[in-house]
Amino acid sequence: MSIPKIIHQIWIGSKTPPTKLMDTWKNKHEKQGFEYIRWSEDEMKKRGFISQLQNKIDDMIEINGKADILRWELLYEYGGFFTDADSYCMEPITYLVEKYKAFAGYENEQVRNTGWCGNTDQYDDVLARTHPVIATGTMAFPPKHELPRLAIEWIKNNDINVDRTGKRAWRTVGPGLLTRLYHGQVWNDITILPSYLFLPIHVTGCAYNGREKIYANQEWGSTKQSYDSMNLVELPPHLKEPTDKVSILISSLNTKAIYIKDCLDSIKNQDGHIFFEIIWINDGSNEINTKILKQMLYEFENTTRFVKVIYSENEGNKGIGYTLNKGIEMCSNEIIIKMDSDDIMIPNRIQIQLDYMKRNPGIAICGGQIAMFRTVKEKVINVTHHPDISWEEYKQKRLHWFINHPTVCYRKSKVLEAGNYDKNLKHMAEDFELELRMLKTHGFIKNLPNVLLWYRVHPEQVTNGSKTKDKGGAHSQYWINIRNNMINKLIN
């Protein structure tokens, strides 16, 4: 049985609810086809919901403990996703509900990991010395699931009053109970997710700053006793959508899955608070490679924050010139990062180039150096050292290699001003020809001294002639002559 598309939140009592936060869940999910239920005393009467644990709810002193008890009953009866009232929704949870049979998340793998209480036996009731704490602020189950049933039975048969037990609600009916029940037997259908998905900032201040998807931010209202000011809460800056935005342009033709994974991982591992629009064009890959690529991009977009993937397929193999011309037009941002599907960016590549382009608005295009490798990127076989170059210098030197195209960062308006990629150049020289036209049109190309990319050298790449075997690789006489003709045409 799957998790129903229902969002449950509870607000009981006479205090003003944190509607600003609660509405984020309603607004993000109703348009995704979810039913949103805000459980109050009136809503329970309206729906005819009668708690089988009302005596325990009445006996529970802590208001958050009363909500803890109710959540178990609601999840057992209806199934769906429960989240606390002090949680701010940033992304709809559709992907998680469709992927997992049931799930919850850790409280924090650093602060509340195994042994978080030291060697004391004070918290043995919540398995503190042997297991990390599992949070109850976000949980999802199908209806009538065994774990919520066991929680209800435990609460029914045990004393949960703090005055008599000396144990707060989090230990008896909240995270402590979930942690005990989860580790009390093997659950093949329950996944415990990383804490950062719903608790990116722990109450202690321990924060997650990576690029994995974050669905919500917890305000810890009960712990901080801050519900009275909850409707004034704003997301911290590093959780808000970035104002800096770039497009990343990538094309592929039957690229190996392991290379694509390395490429995508290097995007996910980028430093900086930057929104990435990824334009990925499939230039005629076969059926199985297309299926693999689409699945990898789907998983990447749904597990990475501050990213949008725009995928397009050509009708057959149109060639790199056609594909990149199309890709430039598709980019919605002025700053475009070029990348090959088989390469690996260094972690601060985009931040370095974006900072440079922002400081130098007159620069149309900038590249950087590459570290070449064959199988393991740590085993570098060569590093380039391209300097800056002007059009006047170029006319004297007539170089065939003066910028590393996979490291290029250019302004869309300047690429279009120079005429964009030539659609008729199918393989090999399309990058060189555009670089020449941009150099002539704008007068200067900046080559940063930084290594920005690990460049994979392998037999299948275009540079080695894998797509032009009758004409050889980039250094064959055929392509040397082609480039010389391009140079002469532009100079003369």
List the model feature ranges, each with a label:
Residues 1-67, 83-240, 355, 487-490:
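Glycosyltransferase-associated regions of secretory-pathway enzymes
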